[in-house]
């Protein structure tokens, strides 16, 4: 029964935030229910106004006499009931006190409320009911369809989601939204809250907020209507206290109580809300996420609720916010909302699944949705009567909420006798009944009256604007939805940014350490360069490396930005700050992190290598390096901000980085650039920096000559005028090369460009900064589609192809075709009846937390018998899942004691395989279909002795039994594009049943987060399995009384893993109730939910206290003694049973290793085929960069610079390596997490089969990619022309292809080796990048073995790229004549009286140079090389070593594979030894 409003508002804790400027005074609690209700009761408007005035007067008198007058709770904490940090804190008293103070000065604290009315509300989207799955072969058809859609010729179908909704919610009221998943609950809430991203509203839609239009509310007053989604997204590095303090500060009003600073206000509000929601103990705990340990899941949910609460919106839309909370905490949350609405006049619209009667009774109104139709709107207390009068029946103990939702499920609604042909059946019939009802007519009249009372643009809007304006800080625009000014937003985001930095220093520290190591390595390679012409190339290479590493230091910022983007978008919707304010602050926050990285790296690099050691030149070097880092940081951030998904950003970014590298001006000098790509050099900021660094190093400097031409025997006494220095820019007769001339001749660089370039760089910096800030403010992430099923092409069932205009993308296939329960039982006969009994005694489980032993389970006893369904319940954190994991033998750490026996015998290796474990998370391979997932489980987990045909037949039985025929061919996909929540849960159960478990099934929270109908269907399914001989142990929280009736026994745990009860439940749970009542608990009320009553009895419900220690009561009870006795008896009797023969000879696994390998390999091949985005991203990296490199180095001549360019073209081809590695790692990690979390504990297959299949699947694809990479790179550069002189064009072409193939295979196996033992792909990518850089530095291109210090020679030998580059260069250019370009020809005047031939013949013969004009007697022209082999010898490459190198490369590939398997075993395979030792100890 619903409590009267006054009682309800004072029942339990008053636990919700009050915005001091939101809502009417406290009297709202005593005002009448609604306009509609009053008119219905015959009270006229005039009379109502009088009653309201009277109530307000009485309320004010009661406040004045409350004894809290004048006490400011923000400053005065003398009253412990007003101090949120006190145990005696009373939130109701705090609320009353605050409202009393603010109501005395209505001018300073104007109030605002926002009720809502809606008429003709129609929302729709575009899409299809079912889509076909993209594969490598059919993705082109999708692309064609997308192009047609782009030009307006697509077959986009309008899908109506909400149809003709009508209703109104007054300020101070609460509306509950009921409907099954897919009925449009979320869409309705989003529409009211203005979150229509990807949705459209019909033109006639009329939504008003007490005189404010929909458009104005969601622009000027954005953040005043809030939508709180199901998901929890927060910065994991922040503590819960800091997260909430940020929200409190962002919405802290300007019109605070006198003497209260903004910080005092925010801190106090934060403390109050945390106290109200029971979060005070998490104040200094990190929020965390899946990867970072932090608060628990339920606490994280409450942090989200607290954040929304602190924003103080007058209208709040809560979407399934109780998901993951136990029933008592969920009730407490709804009561808190009730208090907020009663005291402050705020309005709450709440979609809730599995609403208990106590929760339902808190609400004023209810709206019931059925596949996008409204079938009821009105008072919550009248809804049940409305449908019972229609002809439906509500079973005893079924909650009103469950009854209303069950009406929308054909299999679950019950019709009263005699009404079978009178009740509506389809959604349209229900909607028609509602439209023709008297209740609707009354509702329309009430909406009319509501809108007349609050006309658009009337006084209510003025009042609202005034209240909002009073809160805003100075310098805030009148039309701005934000409370703070722009500068204050930046300051606030800055504070949070530094807290995030402090919370996770690992990234900064690892970057500083990593860059320092890299600087030391590079500096040691180029250690103390001499100041002769020999160091020219080395200095250029060093500066090239330095500027690239500075430029690309910020590339990973793209990833960080994408991780925080959903959080920033959420806060923007809450109107906490501009996204651009966060963008600016994140740039500033990163500066202190960038500074140490930059200083350490550049200092080491500059001074160790003997670059120009003067303060001025170092300053110029550092200035350009830092400016380049900042410019490129903005460019990468801009790319991330512009792209609407991370995948969209990755391939373009890597190609963009490669373009920047090539067109910096070192790998291909400006004079050699082809006109079609020359422009890329102009728009490359790094090119300007590189030019300035070269000018800074070489300009105004003379380098002594290291080698003269001619030199050697006979030339020692030749005059200097007849010699020339060997190098570009040399002049005969000079014993040095002038730096300025070298820059001009070799690079076309001029000293006058030094500061011009800095100006251009600043231009790039400013432009990219503005572009990033603008993009971050304007570009939104991609909206998700509505829920649709995806099928393999050609297998879309006929019913799914028909897209009706009524179809609902939230769940188009809400299955009206569900069969009646009795028809399904025919298929259950296939289930194997279990005979074994699983029993355990005195089970304890201890783990170490921060060096302290902590007991998770404390002497737990129990058993599960075939044909029984046992519930495992407990308070949050009681160790329910831990007990399930310990019993299922899935624990890999900690100390376990006690006995866990099957028929009196210890569990053997096959135990995990013989049990099914239905996990809470529905983890499945996204690309597989439902049938394939079941077949995979059946093939691997059923005994090898069972024929394949029999296994497949059993899968069909499972599909029928679980009613999955309609979507058996559907692809699992991701939520929204694939199976919905219920279908996923059924598949999770199906996968375990398909394995034919011999012993029992464990279920972990199978109903968590489901609506009551889905929860009921899952419980009915478990009951059905049990009735056919299965044994099931199932953890459950938030169960309704009806759900609990499905269970036979209960094991209840209190905090610390102590048993409170283990035994039968009895009919209507009488046995359980009797146990507690006999032991002195209060009586259970007749209509109460016994599960919730029990939580209150043992003190687990918030606000309840136990009058005795119930675990102690159990310990000394007669019932426990009986349990102990029965366990002892079982142990003795069951041992007498004959032991069944072993069904499989493979112990741990059902199938032999070779069979496991082939089944796994088939699945991963299928997965890759169905991931066209991955395969085509790989193809793009193997086509676009090679093609680009090919056309950049188009038809290189065999000049000295030409050969160097060809060498760099190989070097640049290697640069695609890290991108290919990065692409592969997330796919491996996805497969691995599925294996480790679900398939390994189930003993489906061995880790060896998993690893080998994951390595082998990559090889064919990479071999295929070698083909385009080879053709796009080898032929445009023209390397094949070098084979003409030796007449080996075909042979060398084939060998080159082999080398490209080896490179691709090496890439593939190297990726597997790097990710094998490492958790996160990002970490593995970073380590792979470091190792790649090392291989590249020591491969002999940037620094030849002659230049390398002796210490590093071993690295040159160890680097696989040394052999790869050596082989590719040898095959590409060996044996061809060299033709010097004009700037490479040396001009030497012969001594008087000698011609060129006579003077230089001895030298050219000895040095194998070419004399171009032997007969001339002046200006002798010498090309210092005659064949390409001389160039190769200079970098220690011999053609004769080609096949030795190929052999060594194959050894590397084998090594990578073996290392991948070994590392996986070493790091990730649980070692049983550790656990056994722990047990012994």
Curated annotation (Swiss-Prot):
GO terms for cellular component: plasma membrane. The chain crosses the membrane at residues 507-527, 542-562, 587-607, 616-636, 650-670, 758-778, 1174-1194, 1210-1230, 1249-1269, 1298-1318, 1327-1347, 1358-1378, 1446-1466. Residues 134-396, 838-1081 form the ABC transporter domain. GO terms for molecular function: ABC-type transporter activity; ATP binding; ATP hydrolysis activity. Induction: Expression is slightly up-regulated in the presence of miconazole. Keywords: ATP-binding, Cell membrane, Glycoprotein, Membrane, Nucleotide-binding, Repeat, Transmembrane, Transmembrane helix, Transport. InterPro entries: AAA+_ATPase, ABC2_TM, ABC_trans_N, ABC_transporter-like_ATP-bd, ABC_transporter-like_CS, ABCG_dom, ABCG_PDR_1, ABCG_PDR_2. Belongs to the ABC transporter superfamily. ABCG family. PDR (TC 3.A.1.205) subfamily. Residues 1-45, 61-89 are annotated as: Disordered. The lineage of its organism: Eukaryota, Fungi, Dikarya, Ascomycota, Pezizomycotina. ATP binds at residues 874-881. It comes from Aspergillus oryzae (strain ATCC 42149 / RIB 40) (Yellow koji mold). SUPFAM superfamilies: P-loop containing nucleoside triphosphate hydrolases. The gene is atrH. PROSITE patterns: ABC_TRANSPORTER_1 (PS00211), ABC_TRANSPORTER_2 (PS50893). This is ABC multidrug transporter atrH. Pleiotropic ABC efflux transporter involved in the basal level of azole susceptibility. Disruption phenotype: Does not significantly affect miconazole susceptibility.
């Amino acid at each position: 029964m619903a409590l009267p409003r006054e009682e309800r508002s004072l029942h339990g804790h008053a636990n919700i935030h009050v915005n001091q400027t939101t809502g009417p005074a406290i009297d709202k609690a005593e005002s009448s229910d609604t306009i509609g209700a009053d008119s219905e009761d015959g009270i006229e408007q005039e009379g109502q106004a009088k009653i309201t005035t009277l109530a307000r007067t009485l309320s004010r008198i009661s406040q004045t006499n409350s004894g809290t007058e004048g006490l400011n709770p923000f400053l005065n904490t003398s009253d412990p009931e007003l101090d949120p940090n006190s145990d005696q804190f009373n939130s109701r008293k705090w609320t009353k006190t605050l409202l009393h103070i603010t109501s005395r000065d209505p001018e300073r604290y104007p109030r605002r409320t926002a009720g809502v009315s809606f008429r003709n509300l129609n929302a729709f989207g575009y899409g299809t009911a079912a889509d076909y799955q993209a594969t490598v072969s059919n993705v082109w058809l999708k692309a064609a369809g997308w192009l047609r859609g782009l030009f307006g010729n697509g077959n986009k179908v309008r899908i109506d989601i909400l149809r003709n909704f009508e209703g109104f919610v007054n300020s101070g009221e609460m509306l509950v939204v009921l409907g099954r998943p897919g009925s449009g609950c979320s869409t309705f809430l989003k529409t009211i809250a203005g979150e229509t991203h990807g949705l459209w509203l019909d033109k006639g839609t009329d939504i008003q907020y007490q005189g404010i239009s929909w458009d104005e509310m969601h622009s000027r007053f954005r953040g005043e209507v809030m939508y709180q989604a199901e998901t929890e997204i927060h910065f994991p590095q922040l503590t819960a206290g800091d997260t909430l303090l940020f929200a409190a500060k962002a919405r802290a009003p300007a019109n605070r109580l006198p003497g209260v600073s903004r910080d005092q206000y925010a801190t106090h509000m934060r403390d109050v809300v945390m106290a109200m929601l029971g979060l005070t103990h998490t104040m200094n705990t990190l929020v965390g996420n899946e990867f970072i340990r932090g608060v628990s899941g339920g606490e994280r949910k409450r942090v989200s609720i607290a954040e929304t609460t602190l924003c103080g919106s007058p209208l709040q839309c809560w979407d399934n916010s109780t998901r993951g909370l136990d029933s008592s905490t969920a009730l407490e949350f709804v009561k808190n909302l009730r208090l907020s609405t009663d005291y402050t006049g705020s309005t709450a619209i709440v979609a809730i699944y599995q609403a208990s009667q106590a929760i339902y009774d808190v609400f004023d109104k209810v709206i019931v949705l059925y596949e996008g139709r409204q079938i009821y709107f009105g008072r919550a207390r009248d809804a049940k009567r409305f449908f019972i009068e229609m002809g439906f029946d509500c079973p005893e103990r079924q909650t009103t909420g469950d009854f209303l939702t069950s009406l929308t499920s054909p299999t679950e609604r019950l019709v009263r006798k005699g009404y079978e042909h009178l009740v509506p059946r389809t959604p349209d019939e229900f909607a028609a009944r509602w439209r023709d009802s008297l209740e609707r007519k009354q509702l329309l009249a009430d909406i009319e009256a509501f809108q007349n009372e609050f006309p658009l643009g009337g006084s209510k809007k003025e009042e609202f604007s005034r209240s909002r304006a009073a809160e805003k800080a100075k310098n805030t625009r009148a039309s701005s939805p934000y409370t703070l000014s722009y500068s204050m937003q930046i300051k606030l985001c800055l504070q949070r940014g530094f807290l995030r930095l402090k919370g996770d220093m690992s990234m900064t520290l690892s970057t500083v350490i990593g860059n320092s190591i890299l600087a030391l390595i590079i500096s040691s390679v180029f250690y103390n360069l001499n100041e002769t012409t020999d160091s020219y190339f080395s200095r250029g290479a060093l500066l090239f490396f330095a500027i690239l590493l500075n430029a690309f230091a910020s590339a990973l910022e793209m990833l960080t930005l994408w991780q925080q983007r959903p959080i920033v978008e959420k806060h923007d919707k809450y109107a906490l700050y501009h996204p651009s304010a966060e963008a600016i602050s994140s740039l500033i926050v990163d500066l202190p992190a960038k500074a140490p990285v930059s200083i350490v790296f550049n200092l080491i690099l500059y001074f160790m290598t003997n670059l120009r050691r003067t303060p001025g030149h170092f300053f110029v070097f550092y200035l350009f390096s830092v400016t380049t880092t900042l410019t490129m940081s903005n460019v990468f951030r801009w790319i991330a901000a512009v792209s609407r998904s991370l995948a969209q950003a990755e391939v373009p970014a890597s190609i963009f980085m490669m373009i920047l590298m090539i067109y910096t001006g070192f790998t291909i000098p400006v004079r050699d650039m082809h006109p079609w790509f020359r422009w890329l050099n102009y728009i490359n900021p790094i090119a300007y920096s590189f030019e300035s660094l070269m000018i800074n190093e070489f300009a105004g400097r003379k380098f002594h000559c290291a080698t003269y031409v001619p030199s050697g025997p006979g030339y020692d006494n030749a005059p200097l005028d007849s010699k020339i220095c060997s190098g570009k820019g040399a002049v005969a007769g000079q014993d040095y090369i002038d730096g300025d001339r070298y820059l001009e001749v070799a690079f076309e660089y001029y000293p006058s460009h030094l500061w011009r370039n800095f100006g251009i760089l600043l231009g790039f910096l400013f432009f990219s900064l503005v572009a990033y800030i603008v993009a971050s403010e304007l570009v939104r992430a991609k909206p998700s589609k509505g829920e649709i099923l995806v099928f393999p092409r050609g297998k879309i069932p006929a019913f799914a192809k028909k897209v009706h205009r009524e179809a609902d993308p939230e769940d188009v296939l809400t299955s009206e075709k569900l069969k009646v329960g009795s028809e399904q039982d025919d298929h259950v006969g296939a289930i194997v009846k279990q005979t074994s009994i699983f029993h355990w005694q005195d089970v304890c489980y201890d783990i170490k937390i921060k060096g302290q032993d902590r007991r998770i389970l404390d002497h737990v006893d129990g058993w599960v018998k075939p044909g029984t369904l046992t519930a495992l319940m407990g308070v949050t954190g009681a160790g329910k899942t831990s007990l399930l994991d310990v019993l299922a033998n899935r624990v890999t750490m900690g100390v376990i004691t006690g006995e866990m026996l099957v028929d009196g015998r210890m569990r053997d290796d096959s135990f995990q395989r013989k049990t099914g474990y239905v996990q809470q998370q529905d983890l499945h391979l996204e690309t597989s279909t439902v049938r394939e997932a079941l077949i995979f489980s059946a093939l691997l987990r059923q005994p090898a002795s069972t024929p394949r045909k029999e296994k497949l037949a059993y899968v069909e039985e499972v599909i029928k039994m679980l009613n999955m025929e309609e979507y058996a061919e559907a692809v699992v996909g991701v939520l929204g594009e694939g199976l919905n929540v219920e279908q996923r849960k059924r598949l999770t159960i199906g996968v375990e049943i398909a394995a034919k478990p011999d012993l029992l099934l464990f279920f972990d929270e199978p109903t968590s987060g489901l609506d009551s109908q889905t929860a009921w269907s899952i419980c009915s399914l478990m009951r059905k399995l049990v009735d056919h001989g299965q044994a099931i142990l199932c953890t459950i929280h938030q169960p309704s009384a009806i759900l609990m009736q499905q269970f036979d026994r209960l094991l209840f745990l209190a905090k610390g893993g102590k048993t409170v009860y283990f035994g039968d439940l009895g009919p209507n749970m009488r046995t359980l109730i009797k146990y507690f009542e006999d032991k002195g608990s209060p009586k259970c009320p007749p209509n109460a939910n016994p599960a919730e009553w029990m939580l209150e009895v043992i003190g687990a419900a918030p606000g309840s206290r136990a009058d005795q220690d119930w675990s102690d009561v159990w310990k000394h009870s007669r019932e426990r003694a009986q349990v102990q006795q029965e366990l002892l008896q079982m142990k003795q009797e069951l041992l007498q049973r004959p032991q069944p023969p072993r069904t499989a000879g493979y112990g741990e696994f059902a199938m032999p290793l070779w069979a496991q390998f082939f089944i796994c390999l088939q699945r991963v091949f299928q997965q890759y085929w169905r991931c066209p985005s991955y395969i085509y991203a790989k193809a793009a990296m193997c086509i676009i960069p090679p093609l680009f490199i090919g056309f950049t180095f188009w038809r290189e001549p065999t000049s000295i610079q030409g050969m160097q360019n060809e060498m760099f073209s190989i070097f640049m081809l290697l640069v695609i390596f890290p991108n290919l590695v990065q692409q592969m790692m997330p796919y491996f990690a996805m497969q691995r997490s599925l294996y480790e979390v679900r398939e390994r504990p189930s003993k489906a297959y061995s880790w060896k089969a998993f690893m080998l299949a994951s390595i082998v699947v990559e090889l064919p694809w990479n071999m295929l990619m070698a083909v385009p990479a080879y053709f796009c790179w080898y032929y445009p550069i023209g390397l094949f022309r070098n084979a003409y002189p030796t007449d080996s064009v075909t042979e060398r072409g084939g060998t080159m292809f082999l080398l490209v193939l080896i490179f691709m295979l090496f890439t593939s196996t190297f990726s597997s080796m790097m990710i094998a033992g490492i958790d996160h792909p990002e970490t593995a990518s970073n380590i792979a990048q470091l190792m790649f850089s090392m291989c590249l530095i020591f491969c002999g291109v940037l620094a030849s073995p002659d230049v390398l210090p002796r210490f590093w020679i071993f690295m040159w030998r160890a680097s696989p790229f040394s052999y790869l580059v050596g082989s590719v260069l040898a095959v590409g250019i060996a044996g061809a004549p060299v033709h010097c370009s004009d700037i490479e020809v040396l001009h030497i005047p012969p001594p008087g009286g000698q011609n060129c031939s006579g003077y230089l013949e001895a030298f050219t013969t000895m040095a194998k140079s070419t004399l171009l004009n032997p007969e001339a007697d002046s200006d002798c022209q010498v090309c210092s090389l005659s064949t390409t082999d001389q160039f190769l010898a200079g970098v220690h490459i011999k053609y004769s070593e080609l096949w030795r190198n190929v052999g060594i490369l194959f050894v590397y590939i084998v090594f990578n594979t073996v290392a991948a398997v070994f590392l996986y075993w070493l790091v990730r395979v649980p070692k049983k030894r550790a656990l056994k030792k722990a047990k012994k100890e």
